[in-house]
Each structure stands twice: as C-alpha cells, then as structure tokens.
C-alpha cells in the first residue's frame, strides 16, 4: 500500500487478499470486516475501483467453482467505531499484518516436514553407522526391504556375533564357516559356506561390488537392487531357530 492510503481502501485490499487465500485453498469461508465503508463499496453495482472489481470477480469465480465466499460486517456499530480508530493507528505502522489459517491436513503436513528435517539432521550426524551409507536421506517411505534384508543392511538381527554381543545367546559367536565371527558384513561379503558364496556370486553379477551397492542404494532408481538384496538376504541370513543355543 502507498503512504496515505485510506482506511476503506486498505480494508478492501485486506478483503481481496482473503478472497485470494480462499480460492487458492479451494475452501469456502467468511471474511469479516470492521469497515462499513468497504461493505458499502462492494454493494455498489458499478465501481471503477480495481480492488473492488477484483473482489467481485473472486466471488463470482468462487460461485463457479462451488467455493462460497461471504463478506460481512462485524458486530454492533460501537465495535466498528473502535476498529476504525485502531485502523487509523495501524495505518501509520511500517508493516501490515496478514494472518492466515491452515486446515488440519496442512498442519499435519507441515508438522511432518518439520519432523523429517529434524530426523535428517540427527541422521546426518551419525555417518559412522553402516545403514547411513546405504540410506543417507530420511523419508517417510519404506524402501521395500524384507525382514532379512533389513537385518543385513543394519547389522542387527539373526547373527551369532550380534547375539553374543548383547548376551542374548550363549556361544562363541563364530560363523559356521569357522573363519570369523558371524556378523552381517562377514555373512554378506566373506563367508565361505557354499550356499552363501553362490548367492553372493549371483548378487555380485547382478548388482556389482560392495562399492557399487553403496552407490546404487543412494540412487533414486534402485528397485532392481532392492529386489536382488531381498533375494540375497533370504539365502544367506539364517532363521533365528538355526542359531546355536
């Protein structure tokens, strides 16, 4: 608004912004004004004022799109007079306050975005975690890994060394190949048990080396890799009942 803009003109601009907001949200609603002058301007059949014409066009557009925009005066005359006095004081302020409202779905979406941003920040601080290498971005979409593939990627699951580390089972934690502790990395890339070697060979032929896996897991288009990873995990991750007691 230009300096010296009248109260009625300022109120009409506020009403125009309210109409634009309702149309953009495709939502019916009430716009309440304290200015009798603004209501009087809108009641005139013809008006050369651009803002008044834009408000009427917005109301007509809303009718065509089944969006009901209603503009009315607030309360008794004494309240209007008080509002006019407040408006005169506000006219001299360097900025204009505009208050908008969100529906429940928009509030939930904004809250979700805020939480994801917070989780991403925390996740980014933990880049020593093995799963962080494959999944650097926090999202609310499941990547498609099955139960055993999740264990393989995170390192938490049906592995003897994992059970021994947290004292969940007694035993040495040694892999059935006898060469090292049974961890996710060992099972995935080092174990010499024949069926695991065969599954690893098929996986490597389809996907690539360990470095290739880390790179491709970070790509947007990774459906084939996820499928191959699920297949590999089913072949090399043992069931809980098969672990030593």
Curated annotation (Swiss-Prot):
Nucleic acid-binding endonuclease: annotated span: 106-245
EC number, as in UniProt: 2.7.7.49
Source domain of life: Eukaryota
Domain Reverse transcriptase: 1-105
Reaction catalysis annotation: DNA(n) + a 2'-deoxyribonucleoside 5'-triphosphate = DNA(n+1) + diphosphate
Keyword Transferase: yes
Leading EC class: transferase
Entry keyword set: Endonuclease, Hydrolase, Nuclease, Nucleotidyltransferase, RNA-directed DNA polymerase, Transferase, Transposable element
Keyword tRNA processing included in the entry's annotation: no
InterPro entries: RNaseH-like_sf (IPR012337), RNaseH_sf (IPR036397)
Gene Ontology terms, MF aspect: endonuclease activity; nucleic acid binding; RNA-directed DNA polymerase activity
Protein name, per record: Retrovirus-related Pol polyprotein from type-1 retrotransposable element R1
